[in-house]
Amino acid sequence: GASGGDAAASGFTVSAGGSTVLGFSFSGATISSGCGTLTNLTLNGTATGLSGITVSDSDANSVPFEYYDGSGSGNLGECTVQVIHNSASPTVDIYLDGALAIEGFEYRAATGLLTLPTAFTVGIAPAGGAVIADFPFELADGGSYVVVATGLLGDNTTPFDLAATATTFGSSGSDVVGLEIYHGSTDAPAVDIYANGSALLTDFSYGDFSGFVEVPAADYVLGVAPAGGDPIAGFTAPLSGLGGGSAVVFASGFLSGDDPAFGLFAALNDGMVLELSALEQDC
């Protein structure tokens, strides 16, 4: 049989016959994509499960969908996610779909590579406290993503948020290193980034991701300059030992001199975070 769910709540008539479930509405009501449960199915007799399920619209076109059995399992895919705490805020607890997943997650810390379902909700709570914000995600099956906690709690200009981008973990060969760069300094202007004197990124603004790039596995001096200007800071990036791997390099802290001070950090695939040493001389 078939009953209930958001189809019934939206005024649909839902019925089942044989192997077909029909749902139709005389009011023209629709059900929002990705929201709620379409309908509940019950099995009679000796039936123990469902197979070969298809969902079609009124023109017999296939419609993508997700289904769950009584234990809550279903056809959700999986993706790979790394989470980085780059909000100058207190230590937090991270919840996934209401369950505590990361306890005591400190500023400038990172997880390793997590395997997660493609649809999930991240809850953020002060350490030991209740969840104060939820962030739903719907990602691609088989995809790889970095999620960065960024911005400032209670700030209207650069509010707290979870920024995410598709990326690649690892690299195409042992002689190159994969990089994803994130501008996470809330008071820093748009900048140009130089690697050993050559422009790597230009007009790179707060909240921007670079997109995945590969560079030769070597040690670099990264210069940071106001967009269109001369470098005002330099950092050493010892990447020679990371061939075949990758890192997420993120700008962090305040350029104004407030604590925590501005710096560049690199999150490795295993969750280790390296602070890139600042250079005193011009670069």
Residue ranges of predicted features:
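Intrinsically disordered, low-complexity polar regions and short flexible loop motifs
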Residues: 77-283
